[in-house]
Amino acid sequence: MREMLQVERPKLILDDGKRTDGRKPDELRSIKIELGVLKNADGSAIFEMGNTKAIAAVYGPKEMHPRHLSLPDRAVLRVRYHMTPFSTDERKNPAPSRREIELSKVIREALESAVLVELFPRTAIDVFTEILQADAGSRLVSLMAASLALADAGIPMRDLIAGVAVGKADGVIILDLNETEDMWGEADMPIAMMPSLNQVTLFQLNGSMTPDEFRQAFDLAVKGINIIYNLEREALKSKYVEFKEEGV
């Protein structure tokens, strides 16, 4: 009976060297970015990476309530990461899970390294991220949506944040894992950076790699991050050009 219940591990790298979704090992999923999608937010963005889709909204800087929680030398950055009940195959409980609370903290810490919070003492900046559809990489997609929403709000930043997960599947180092690879691969390593500063803002590793595999994976992540970073900058430039043409 136990043998009947066992699920056979899928082959992740096919005989032609490609992955189950048709990509090469060093290939990103398709990326789509939209800015200013919510008129009632100070800044907002949608970031899509393959089948993973996140929306972020920013409010602030604004007066901190309650006031006794404000800081005299910097803004307080408050971040909420949340997965909508319809974002996965199985409807999830709308109440915040332990994972969502933990990832809210991870994303906040990554954003704090980028936002010039010292320019806005005794204020609060609220960042809300919602996963609309999940297919691996949700923490990074949320982080990038939040980074772009902050830029859309005109909040000064040291740099935009770009990130991607690298991993190992069937012994091959791969870029930008999908859900099947995330579930069945031997390793998963999400990395986010401020590329112009060459500074890592988020780093996690699940699974194991040899030192050589780690170096190969990190180099591949940097390559992917630079591609994503250029797409982020182009999205911001396009919005400014659009505003200028409209006379805003």
Swiss-Prot record:
Subcellular location: Cytoplasm
UniProt-listed GO biological process terms: gene expression; rRNA catabolic process
Pfam entry (one): RNase_PH_C
UniProt xrefs under InterPro entries: ExoRNase_PH_dom1 (IPR001247), ExoRNase_PH_dom2 (IPR015847), ExoRNase_PH_dom2_sf (IPR036345), PNPase/RNase_PH_dom_sf (IPR027408), Ribosomal_Su5_D2-typ_SF (IPR020568), RNase_PH (IPR050080), Rrp41 (IPR011807)
Molecular-function annotations in GO: 3'-5'-RNA exonuclease activity; RNA binding
CDD domains according to UniProt: RNase_PH_archRRP41
Effect listed in the UniProt record for changing R99E: Abolishes exoribonuclease activity
Subunit structure: Component of the archaeal exosome complex. Forms a hexameric ring-like arrangement composed of 3 Rrp41-Rrp42 heterodimers. The hexameric ring associates with a trimer of Rrp4 and/or Csl4 subunits.
Family as reported in the entry's similarity comment: Belongs to the RNase PH family. Rrp41 subfamily.
Protein name stated in the entry: Exosome complex component Rrp41
Biological classification of the source: Archaea, Thermoproteota, Thermoprotei, Sulfolobales, Sulfolobaceae
